[in-house]
């Protein structure tokens, strides 16, 4: 049994609500979002999502819809998900301030609607610091990263300097590469010729957890 378009849309709504606010939407909120007259239709669609292994519901608990972790969802269930739902690992933290170590992983996977990002990201990183504040990127945000080594001057990139990673505005001139903050309280990073420098990916959107 495959998911209908409306069931895929409800799954996306639940996913985005949990990732943004930390809790699932209520059945009344789902009904309102889709123009249902009451929660009975919502309950039917939630029954299907639970049967297909996409969610689980905590009995007698308000906002008790839970997404099943990726490792709990079998391959058949994954195949039934909408192509517009991205399954993205959170690989760790990236500095919007001073570079931080690149070996920090969270070990999480989240489901997100593709519409939040352009181009489609390959993974998420959690921002630490506020050097990109004027680009609307704040401490604690999850940023989508499109994995590529190709970038142009003026793009926001995730870059590796030696064994550290950072998110900055890339500025390439004839004789130097700079990583520019978007906050006047921070100084640009000049990439030296003796440093191991690489572009890890392009910034392609963000998710802001409720806090």
From Swiss-Prot:
Q: Which residues form the DNA-binding region?
A: 27-47
Key word Thylakoid present in the record? no
Pfam family name, one: Peptidase_S24
Q: Where are the transmembrane segments?
A: none
User: Self-association or partners: how does it assemble?
Assistant: Homodimer.
- Cross-referenced PANTHER family, in alphabetical order? LEXA REPRESSOR, LEXA REPRESSOR-RELATED
Its annotated function is as follows: Represses a number of genes involved in the response to DNA damage (SOS response), including recA and lexA. In the presence of single-stranded DNA, RecA interacts with LexA causing an autocatalytic cleavage which disrupts the DNA-binding part of LexA, leading to derepression of the SOS regulon and eventually DNA repair.
Please give the name of this protein: LexA repressor
Query: Top-down, what is the taxonomic lineage of the species of origin?
Result: Bacteria, Pseudomonadati, Pseudomonadota, Gammaproteobacteria, Lysobacterales
């Amino acid at each position: 049994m495959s998911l209908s378009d409306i069931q895929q849309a409800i799954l996306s709504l639940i996913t985005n609500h949990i990732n943004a606010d930390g809790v699932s939407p209520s059945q009344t909120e789902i009904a309102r979002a889709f123009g249902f007259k009451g929660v009975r239709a919502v309950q039917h669609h939630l029954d299907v999502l639970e049967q297909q292994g996409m969610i689980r519901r905590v009995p007698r608990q308000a906002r008790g819809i839970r997404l099943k972790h990726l490792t709990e969802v079998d391959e058949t269930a994954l195949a039934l998900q909408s192509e517009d739902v991205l399954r993205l690992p959170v690989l760790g933290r990236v500095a919007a301030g001073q570079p931080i170590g690149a070996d920090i992983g969270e070990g999480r996977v989240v489901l997100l609607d593709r519409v939040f990002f352009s181009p489609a990201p390959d993974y998420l990183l959690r921002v630490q610091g506020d050097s990109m504040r004027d680009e609307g990127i704040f401490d604690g945000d999850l940023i989508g990263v499109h994995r590529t080594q190709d970038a142009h001057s003026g793009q926001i990139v995730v870059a590796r300097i030696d064994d550290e990673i950072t998110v900055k505005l890339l500025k390439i001139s004839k004789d130097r590469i700079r990583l520019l903050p978007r906050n006047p309280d921070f100084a640009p990073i000049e990439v030296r010729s003796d440093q191991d420098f690489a572009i890890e990916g392009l910034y392609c959107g963000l998710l802001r957890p409720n806090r």
